[in-house]
């Protein structure tokens, strides 16, 4: 598994994917600051936007581009014809994507702490960090989801599905259906944790996100093995 991760890191070393890990949270923060800079709830609004839209689309772009480049270059022939266990390879690709998303989330929270000080917001830094971590855990299922979807369709279709998922999350956010819509889990959790409301129901969102991520990872790996 370590060798697979090393190979994946080398593949993205000189690609735009490595740059996007740093660039996407910067773009997100700059754009949201430009829109909400005069709002007293600036930090909360930005955290909310990140939880249901920016993180989703950023994961789709990062994982999607990594899969897209390899699909376009070789159609995975060098992997499919190698003695490497395909199940382990796909799990390694997913873990690589998760590491990238974790780095991106760290960059985002650092930028958000800077925004908090610049605009003298009152949100507690500890709660901000907890909220970003919670949203990340509840959204990790998106990594195997996009890895599988881009591989069987294409990058644009996958991003389109992700965009529609986020839009639908907005309409469902104030209904009982939001608990059943995975694209809504990050936003629901952020709305609670940013206020320090760590109720049991919020932890169930994290658990569901992790379980769904494991299920989709296994599904994506077996799908790749049978390709």
Residue ranges and their predicted role:
Residues 38-41, 159, 163-227:
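Terminal transmembrane helical anchor/hairpin motif
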Residues 1-22:
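Aromatic- and glycine-rich beta-strand/loop motifs that create alpha-glucan
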Residues 23-33, 105-113, 206-220:
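Hydrophobic core of alpha-helical transmembrane segments in multi-pass integral membrane proteins
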Residues 66-98:
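Helix-loop-helix units of permease transmembrane domains in multi-pass membrane transporters
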Residues 111-132:
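Membrane-interfacial helix-loop-helix connectors in multipass membrane proteins
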Residues 16-17, 86-115:
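Selective transmembrane-helix segments that form parts of the transport pathway or gating/packing helices
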Residues 126-153, 210-219:
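Hydrophobic alpha-helical transmembrane segments of polytopic membrane proteins
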Residues 47-69:
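Long, hydrophobic alpha-helical segments
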């Amino acid at each position: 598994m370590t060798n697979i991760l090393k190979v994946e890191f080398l593949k993205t070393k000189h690609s735009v994917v490595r740059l996007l890990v740093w660039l996407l949270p910067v773009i997100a923060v700059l754009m949201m600051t430009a829109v909400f800079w005069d709002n007293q709830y600036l930090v909360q609004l930005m955290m909310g936007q990140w939880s249901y839209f920016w993180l989703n689309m950023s994961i789709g772009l990062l994982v999607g581009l990594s899969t897209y480049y390899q699909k376009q270059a070789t159609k995975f022939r060098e992997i499919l014809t190698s003695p490497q266990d395909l199940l382990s390879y796909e799990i390694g690709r997913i873990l690589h994507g998760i590491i990238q998303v974790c780095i991106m989330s760290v960059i985002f929270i650092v930028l958000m702490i800077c925004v908090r000080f610049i605009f003298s917001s009152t949100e507690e830094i500890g709660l901000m960090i907890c909220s970003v971590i919670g949203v990340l855990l509840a959204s990790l299922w998106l990594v195997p989801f996009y890895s599988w979807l881009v591989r069987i369709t294409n990058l644009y279709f996958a991003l389109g599905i992700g965009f529609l998922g986020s839009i639908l999350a907005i309409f469902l956010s104030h209904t009982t259906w939001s608990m059943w819509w995975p694209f809504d889990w990050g936003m629901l959790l952020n709305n609670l944790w940013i206020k320090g409301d760590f109720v049991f129901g919020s932890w169930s969102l994290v658990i569901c996100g992790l379980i769904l991520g494991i299920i989709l990872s296994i599904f994506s790996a077996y799908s790749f093995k049978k390709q």
